[in-house]
Each structure stands twice: as structure tokens, then as C-alpha cells.
Amino acid sequence: MSHGDSNPAAVPHAADDIQGDDRWMSQHNRFVSDCKDKEPDVLFVGDSMVQLLQQYEIWRELFSPLHALNFWIGGDTTGHVLWRLKNGELENIKPKVIVVWVGTNNYGNTAEEVAGGIEAIVRLINTQQPQAKVIVLGLLPRGEKPNPLRQKNAKVNHLLKASLPKLPNVQLLDVDAGFVHSDGTISYHDMFDFLHLTGGAYAKICKPLHELIMQLLEETPEEKRAALA
């Protein structure tokens, strides 16, 4: 598997300001500011898959009560998230759980490179936030019909199942709620554009995620000490 500077998916870099309005950097700066003003117990980091989660009622129902922050930027790749985390989005906070969901936008990378990029994110979190338990969400299938990107995302998940157990304080959560039907298609009822999830689909994946987060929060030393007091 590709690691370090030899892996382009593991090289931190800011997104190019293609449209010319500097929105990507503005969003990053807002997240850095949030780190100075808020005290999250749970931090979500990733791309538009994380972004849209915050737009549905399931976020307010399950995650807002956990003092969660959502550091999303649509279109982000592993390299973009690495850059953001290296440049302030992990400073001045001490979350107990960090959820990472990124990789489906790494179109130009191999499965090995994408998995290596996700591992690099986990290693960075381990270094900068050693107290945090990390949850990596598996990449979902995409496209209405079978296609190479589906196959690549599945391979990324397979690679992560083998590699992540070797890293501390991290586990992979498969959140595919059977989105691919027996005929190989994905319904727009689950993914409205055959990539991004509908509210109903988020409800399916968030229940096991919420259960795992609650389990990890209860396992933190602070919670244990409080229970013994």
C-alpha cells in the first residue's frame, strides 16, 4: 500500500480555487474559528457525505446532543482533509471521538492510494489527538449501475479492514445498508443522485453509527472516572 510522499493521496494540499471566490479557504477558516469557540465531544470530518448529514433532522436528533461539530467541505479528497487537519482544525479542541468519512472524491487515485490517504489521516489524528477514538466510515457504492468507482470503493474498504486494526484507537464501520439491489442497481430513494444519501438513507446508516459513538464515549477515561465517583 502507498504511504507518505510517494502516495499522492497522502500529501496534504489545499483545494485549488477554481471558481475564484475562495469559498474553500473561507470554510476552513470558519472551522478553525469554531475550534477556538467550541468544545466538541464528537468531531465529524470529511466531504459532502458528512456535509449533507448535518442538513437532516437525524443530525439534530442523534448528534447535536453529543456536542458534535461537523467540519465538511464538499468535493474534498483525502489530501484536502489532511491539509485542513494540519492547519488548525485539530487545535484548541479535545474531542473524545472523531468520525472520518472521505475518499469517494479521490477519482484519480488507485484504491491502494486512497486507503493510504485515509490511513495518513488516522495517523495524524493519533498524533495530534491521542485521546480520541477514531471511527472511519467505509466508502459507499456509487452510480445507479455497476461501475469501476464502485469496485474501487469496495477495494478501499477491503484494504482498510486489513490495515486499520494495526493503528491505535481506530475502527472501521461499514455503513452500507444494502444500498445495492439484487439486480446491481442503486435506487434514487436511497441516493437521490446515485451518490449522495437521502434523509431516509441517512437514518439507516446513522443508527449503528450513533450506537458506536455512544459506546466509545462511555469507554473514555473521563466517563469511567465519573462512573466510579
Swiss-Prot record:
A GO CC annotation given for this chain: 1-alkyl-2-acetylglycerophosphocholine esterase complex
Subcellular location as annotated: Cytoplasm
Keyword Lipid metabolism: yes
Active site (catalytic residues): 48, 193, 196
UniProt keyword list: Cytoplasm, Hydrolase, Lipid degradation, Lipid metabolism
Molecular function GO labels: 1-alkyl-2-acetylglycerophosphocholine esterase activity; platelet-activating factor acetyltransferase activity; protein heterodimerization activity; protein homodimerization activity
A GO BP entry: spermatogenesis
Domain of life: Eukaryota
Entry keyword Endoplasmic reticulum: no
Catalysed reaction equations from the record: a 1-O-alkyl-2-acetyl-sn-glycero-3-phosphocholine + H2O = a 1-O-alkyl-sn-glycero-3-phosphocholine + acetate + H(+); 1-O-hexadecyl-2-acetyl-sn-glycero-3-phosphocholine + H2O = 1-O-hexadecyl-sn-glycero-3-phosphocholine + acetate + H(+); 1-O-hexadecyl-2-acetyl-sn-glycero-3-phosphate + H2O = 1-O-hexadecyl-sn-glycero-3-phosphate + acetate + H(+); 1-O-hexadecyl-2-acetyl-sn-glycero-3-phosphoethanolamine + H2O = 1-O-hexadecyl-sn-glycero-3-phosphoethanolamine + acetate + H(+)
Entry EC number(s): 3.1.1.47
Gene3D superfamilies linked to this entry: SGNH hydrolase
Transmembrane segments: none
InterPro entries linked: SGNH_hydro, SGNH_hydro_sf
Enzyme kind, highest EC tier: hydrolase
Coiled coil feature spans: none
Task of the protein: Alpha2 catalytic subunit of the cytosolic type I platelet-activating factor (PAF) acetylhydrolase (PAF-AH (I)) heterotetrameric enzyme that catalyzes the hydrolyze of the acetyl group at the sn-2 position of PAF and its analogs and modulates the action of PAF.
Note: Originally the subunits of the type I platelet-activating factor (PAF) acetylhydrolase was named alpha (PAFAH1B1), beta (PAFAH1B2) and gamma (PAFAH1B3). Now these subunits have been renamed beta (PAFAH1B1), alpha2 (PAFAH1B2) and alpha1 (PAFAH1B3) respectively.
SUBUNIT field: Forms a catalytic dimer which is either homodimer (alpha2/alpha2 homodimer) or heterodimer with PAFAH1B3 (alpha2/alpha1 heterodimer). Component of the cytosolic (PAF-AH (I)) heterotetrameric enzyme, which is composed of PAFAH1B1 (beta), PAFAH1B2 (alpha2) and PAFAH1B3 (alpha1) subunits. The catalytic activity of the enzyme resides in the alpha1 (PAFAH1B3) and alpha2 (PAFAH1B2) subunits, whereas the beta subunit (PAFAH1B1) has regulatory activity. Trimer formation is not essential for the catalytic activity.
PANTHER family documented for this protein: PLATELET-ACTIVATING FACTOR ACETYLHYDROLASE, PLATELET-ACTIVATING FACTOR ACETYLHYDROLASE IB SUBUNIT ALPHA2
Stated family: Belongs to the 'GDSL' lipolytic enzyme family. Platelet-activating factor acetylhydrolase IB beta/gamma subunits subfamily.
Protein name: Platelet-activating factor acetylhydrolase IB subunit alpha2
